[in-house]
Amino acid sequence: MSEERTERPERTERPERPQQRGSGPRKRRPFQRRKVCRFCADKTLVIDYKDPRVLRSFITERGKIVPRRISGNCSAHQREITEAIKRARNIALIPIASTHVIA
């Protein structure tokens, strides 16, 4: 092995980065009012696994539980909704998927 080191070639300047697409001002989404948890707003509403009518409004047509950011529930009530839906599915009060989906 030789003790000689080879010199690295001197770095050249980097080429200019291409401009990002749409370098103009960004379009903003219109202001959307924050959703309010319907269970916090109306204290008379109760989350119950035996009431499939209320639970179906929190399930998609494919049978998935609607997320918090879409339903507008607070985290505490979203957890209760999730537990109630799972209990109702377990004892067959609501179907796991409303229809058979062929993909």
From Swiss-Prot:
GO CC field: cytosolic small ribosomal subunit
What InterPro entries is this protein classified in?
Answer: Ribosomal_bS18 (IPR001648), Ribosomal_bS18_CS (IPR018275), Ribosomal_bS18_sf (IPR036870)
| Described function | Binds as a heterodimer with protein bS6 to the central domain of the 16S rRNA, where it helps stabilize the platform of the 30S subunit.
User: What protein family is recorded?
Assistant: Belongs to the bacterial ribosomal protein bS18 family.
Q: Where is the composition biased (Basic and acidic residues)?
A: 1-19
**What is one Gene Ontology biological process annotated in the Swiss-Prot or TrEMBL record?**
translation
Q: Which GO terms describe its molecular function?
A: small ribosomal subunit rRNA binding; structural constituent of ribosome
The protein's name? Small ribosomal subunit protein bS18
The annotated region (Disordered) lies at 1-33
Q: Kindly state which keywords UniProt assigns to this record, in alphabetical order.
A: Ribonucleoprotein, Ribosomal protein, RNA-binding, rRNA-binding
Superkingdom of origin: Bacteria
Any single Pfam family the record assigns to this protein: Ribosomal_S18
Gene3D superfamilies cross-referenced by the UniProt entry: Ribosomal protein S18 (4.10.640.10)
Task: Describe the protein's quaternary organization and the partners it interacts with.
Answer: Part of the 30S ribosomal subunit. Forms a tight heterodimer with protein bS6.
The family database entries (HAMAP family) matched by this protein are listed as: Ribosomal_bS18 (MF_00270)
Keyword check for Ribonucleoprotein, yes or no. yes
Q: Where is the composition biased (Basic residues)?
A: 24-33
